[in-house]
UniProtKB/Swiss-Prot annotation:
PROSITE patterns, A to Z: MAGE
InterPro entries per record: MAGE, MAGE_WH1, MAGE_WH2, MHD_dom
Biased composition (Low complexity): 138-156
Feature: compositional bias, Polar residues: 85-96, 104-130, 158-177, 220-232, 256-306, 328-344, 364-380, 414-428
Organism from which the protein derives: Macaca fascicularis
Gene3D superfamilies from the UniProt entry: MAGE homology domain, winged helix WH1 motif, MAGE homology domain, winged helix WH2 motif
Annotated region described as Interaction with DTNA, given as residue ranges: 743-957
Quaternary structure, from the entry: Interacts with DTNA. Interacts with TRIM28.
UniProt entry tagged with the keyword Cell membrane: yes
Protein name stated in the entry: Melanoma-associated antigen E1
Domain of life: Eukaryota
One GO term describing the cellular component: plasma membrane
Predominant location category: cytoplasm
Length: 957
């Protein structure tokens, strides 16, 4: 007899034994089918046929387990996996073989997850699991036959149990664990029956699979999955019954699916998810609950999955994490409730999904998040109610969507749940949905709840894509204001671009080439470059106090010169702060032309038009918010007041007291007329108002007592202080002469002068209380006399005037009248760093005879503390900026070079200023260098004669 015939006979005998054992097992389980077993031997024994220990396909036992791997044959073979130890779980991952056989191998462990791949045949195959037993469990594979076989798990018992599967009949096929493939795997349940429950999963295909839960009956439920298809999947939930129920969620698919969850039952409920697929899965165990709680890890698809465990609840709670698909999925379980709570997270599709379950309520609630599709979806939980609540959340479509309440049966991808309660009173159900929030589909981010609105961004300008002239400006402390701008002239736009380039380029102090300026002009307008350059130069001179001069006519290079120079200045437009003061004059002009008040949004629009609000903010202005709300307001150039009866609150700008003092409306009107290329009389109302103010000022100058915001009595009373009758001034009637000695009065006056000079750099008003705190409270009786003495010293010695800034608050400030020729042209400035040694180098070259060897200049810098490597950087920068030029020394071997003054140095400073600088450093007089002094005098005379012929860009206006 051949070996094949012997093996066939042995298999037939094993199949016959398994059939006999299966019939006896059916008779034994039939009485207990309708409900739970009467006796529970222990905590490790399954509590019912719907226990997760049976449904997961593995049996826990206290003793050792034995696994026998069958030999593959031509016919279908069946393998029964052995039991494992306590607290161990196993998931079977099948592999495909050529023969029709199924093999499951479980490795026993103590708390670890074991996966054994069974062999899947092309034909029908059978996979049977064993029930848990307290004793030794022995598993033996049956004999395969040519017919399909059916395996039935054994009944758990206290002793040793042996499970032999019977021979399969010609009836329906059994459960096969799916093979993980590139697509998501799916398990499908069968219809309900009165027999024991046998989960039979199908072979996974690359396409979509279908999950159909069984219809529960009064007996034990049996789930038999149908064949997976690539079409549309529709899971149908079972009806509620009094016995235990089994719920299995649908698996992910690439198509759209409709899922209807089962209604909640009065008994215990256990939920199970399918086996993991190819992707990674992360599951967090559930927290402890007062009742029985079962948590099953989700099935991982191709994308990562994150499952958050449910919070403890008062009753029985079953939490089933989602089954991730190709996209990212995040599931947040429900919060604790007093009653029974069942939460089933969504089944994500290809796109990311974010699900937030409802807040806790007093009654029992069932919450089902939406099923994610290709797009992203964000669902917001409702507010908690007193009674049972029902939360219906939408499914995510292909585009970003917001959370709305869909009607059941509208179409696929609709998931809804009913309220689970004992009385099932629909009138007590409340549905509360907050305002929907739309999320971006391009951002893959996990969110556990709705995020708050973004905080206001100061000085933010938002432009509408559909309407280019419509912008939204966020001011200092106001909400967003929508403004419709007038269309900008293309010529003015080119002028603004060129203006921005000139200001930024000037920070580096490098000469500006004409070719570089042409690059910032649109090609269609480059033929009008002279007109654009003329307008930009006019803006530079009027607003920023810079003069555009031609440095080299042959190379066509230009530089910017600060116009705050050699002539005495009067008023605000000639102040040393330069560009900031020019910007302030624009703000004052806007306020004056707008009716002596301007809203914050209008000021922001004007600054935006000037380029201050762009992303490339100029360091020449610093922080625009600080410039408006801190510097100009604190210095009392501007007043910042809220608009009355306006919601939301808006603010307006007005002229401050310092602006009324340091300038006039006529000067501001002429300045604005120069900017807009108009005549001051083009604004007749403002022009008449400015004339009336000038007449009032002229009339007030003839009186000793001046009105508000005018120069006080200090200017007129300063000459009377020296005479014995000086106390006959405005204070003679109020305050009697004091008995203080003259020396003490002079000492207090000098201290007061030091205070004013110290506070002059901050431009902050000095109140009377602060002055008395500094010089002493005892000086309050002689305070007017001390002010007169200090005003006389400041006027005659320092060239400044002490004026009353605010008579009501008794605050004072200095009005500076110093001439710019008394200060150096080239000084250290935060806007022009790197000039710390420029005046030293230029003075050294002039003292050395207008030229100095390169080695001598480096030795001079080394004497000033400059490091060896940095002296080369300093001289190279001055050479490139044309402050100095390098000439080769004739007949020098090796070749040597000497430095001389460059064209920029001759424009920005003079030899007399350099000589005075050296004399101040060495504590000498300029005449101590007679040769250099005579040369400096001749240079001053030549500058006076040819000053109007120095490299000007002609015909600006």
């Amino acid at each position: 007899m051949s070996l094949v015939s012997q093996n066939s006979r042995r298999r037939r005998r094993r199949v016959a034994k398994a059939t006999a054992h299966n019939s006896s097992w059916d008779e034994m389980q039939a009485p207990n089918a309708p409900g739970f077993p009467a006796d529970m031997p222990g905590s490790d024994v399954p509590q019912g046929p719907s226990d997760s220990q049976i449904l997961q396909g593995l049996c826990a036992s206290e003793g050792p387990s034995t696994s026998v791997l069958p030999t593959s044959a031509e016919g279908p073979s069946t393998f029964v996996p052995p039991t494992i130890s306590e607290a161990s779980s196993a998931s079977g991952q099948p592999t495909v073989s050529e023969g029709p056989g199924t093999s499951l191998l479980a490795t026993p462990s103590e708390g670890l997850s074991t996966s054994g791949p069974p062999t899947i045949s092309k034909g029908l195959c059978t996979s049977v699991t064993l029930a848990a037993s307290e004793g030794r469990n022995t598993s033996r594979p049956p004999t395969s036959s040519e017919e399909p076989s059916t395996s039935v798990p054994a009944t758990p018992g206290e002793g040793t149990s042996t499970s032999v599967p019977p021979t399969a009949s010609e009836g329906p096929s059994t459960s096969v664990v799916p093979t993980p493939d590139e697509g998501p795997s799916t398990s499908v349940q069968s219809t309900a029956g009165e027999g024991p429950s046998t989960p039979v999963p199908l072979t996974a295909t690359e396409g979509l699979s279908t999950s159909v839960p069984d219809t529960p009956d009064e007996g034990l439920s049996t789930s038999v999955p149908p064949t997976a298809t690539e079409g549309l999947s529709t899971p149908v939930p079972p009806t509620p019954d009094e016995g235990p129920s089994t719920s299995m969620p649908a698996t992910p698919g690439e198509g759209r699916s409709t899922t209807m969850l089962p209604a909640a039952s009065d008994g215990q409920s256990i939920s199970l998810v399918p086996t993991p697929g190819k992707g990674s899965s992360t599951s967090g165990p559930p927290t402890a609950t007062e009742g029985l709680s079962t948590s099953v890890q989700p099935t991982a698809g191709e994308g990562p999955s994150t499952s958050v465990p449910p919070t403890p609840c008062g009753g029985l709670s079953t939490s089933v994490p989602p089954t991730p698909g190709e996209g990212l999925s995040t599931s947040v379980p429900p919060t604790a409730t007093e009653g029974l709570s069942t939460s089933v997270p969504p089944t994500p599709g290809e796109g990311p999904s974010t699900s937030v379950l409802p807040t806790p309520g007093e009654g029992r609630s069932t919450s089902v998040p939406p099923t994610a599709s290709d797009g992203s979806d964000t669902s917001v939980p409702p507010t908690p109610g007193e009674g049972p609540s029902t939360l219906v959340q939408p499914t995510a479509s292909d585009r970003p969507g917001s959370s709305v309440l869909p009607n059941p049966g509208e179409g696929p991808s609709t998931l809804f749940s009913s309220s689970a309660s004992v009385d099932r009173n629909p009138s007590k159900c409340s549905i509360v949905l907050p305002s929907p929030r739309v999320t971006k589909a391009s951002v893959d981010s996990d969110s556990e709840g709705p995020k708050g609105a973004e905080g206001p961004i100061e000085f933010e300008v938002l432009r509408d894509c559909e309407s280019p002239n419509s912008i939204t400006i966020m001011g200092l402390s106001t909400p967003r204001v929508a403004i419709t701008l007038k269309p900008q002239d293309p010529m003015e736009q080119n002028v603004a671009e060129l203006l921005q380039f000139l200001l930024v380029k000037d920070q580096s102090k490098y000469p500006i080439r004409e070719s570089e300026m042409r690059e910032y002009i649109v090609k269609e307008y480059r033929n009008q470059f002279p007109e654009i350059l003329r307008r930009a130069a006019a803006h530079l001179e009027c607003i920023f106090r810079f003069e555009l001069r031609e440095l080299d006519p042959e190379a066509r290079t230009y530089i910017l010169l600060n116009k705050l120079g050699p002539v005495p200045f009067e008023g605000l437009e000639e102040s040393p702060n330069g560009p900031k003061m020019g910007l302030l004059m624009m703000i004052l002009g806007q306020i004056f032309l707008n009716g002596n008040q301007a809203k914050e949004a209008e000021i922001c629009e004007m600054l935006w038009r000037m380029g201050v609000q762009r992303e490339r903010r100029l360091s020449i202005f610093g922080n625009p918010k600080r410039l408006l709300s801190v510097e100009f307001v604190w210095q009392r150039y501007l007043d910042y007041r809220p608009v009355t009866d306006c919601k939301p609150v808006e603010y307006e700008f007005f002229w401050g007291p310092r602006s009324h003092l340091e300038t006039t409306k006529m000067k501001i009107l002429k300045f604005m007329a120069k900017i807009y290329n108009k005549d001051p009389m083009d604004w007749p109302e403002q022009y008449n108002e400015a004339l009336e103010e000038d007449a009032a000022r002229a009339f007030a100058e003839g009186w000793q007592a001046l009105p508000h915001f005018r120069r006080p009595f200090f200017e007129e009373a300063a000459a009377e202080v020296a005479s014995p009758d000086s106390e006959v001034s405005s204070y003679s009637s109020k305050y009697a002469p004091h008995s203080w000695p003259e020396s003490r009065l002079e000492s207090k006056a000098r201290k007061l002068v030091q205070l004013f000079l110290l506070m002059d750099s901050t431009k902050l008003p000095i109140p009377k209380e602060g002055i008395l705190y500094y010089i002493g409270r005892e000086c309050s009786k002689v305070f007017p006399d001390l002010l007169n003495r200090a005003a006389r010293t400041l006027n005659h010695v320092y060239g400044t005037e002490l004026v009353v800034l605010d008579p009501r608050n008794h605050s004072y400030t200095l009005y500076n009248r110093r001439e710019m020729e008394e200060t150096e042209e080239i000084v250290d400035s935060p806007n022009r760093p790197g000039n710390n040694f420029l005046m030293q180098v230029l003075s050294f070259i002039f003292i050395m005879g207008n030229h100095a060897r390169e080695s001598a200049v480096w030795a001079f810098l080394r004497g000033l503390g400059v490091q060896s490597g940095r002296k080369h950087v300093i001289t190279c920068r001055y050479l490139s900026q044309r402050y100095i030029d390098s000439l080769r020394v004739p007949d020098s071997d090796p070749v040597q070079y000497e430095f001389v003054w460059g064209p920029r140095a001759r424009l920005e400073t003079s030899k007399m200023k350099a000589l005075r600088y050296v004399a101040r450093i060495h504590r000498k007089e300029p005449q101590d260098w007679p040769q250099q002094y005579r040369e400096a005098m001749e240079d001053e005379a030549n500058r006076a004669d040819v000053g109007h012929r120095q490299f000007f860009v002609h015909n600006f206006r």
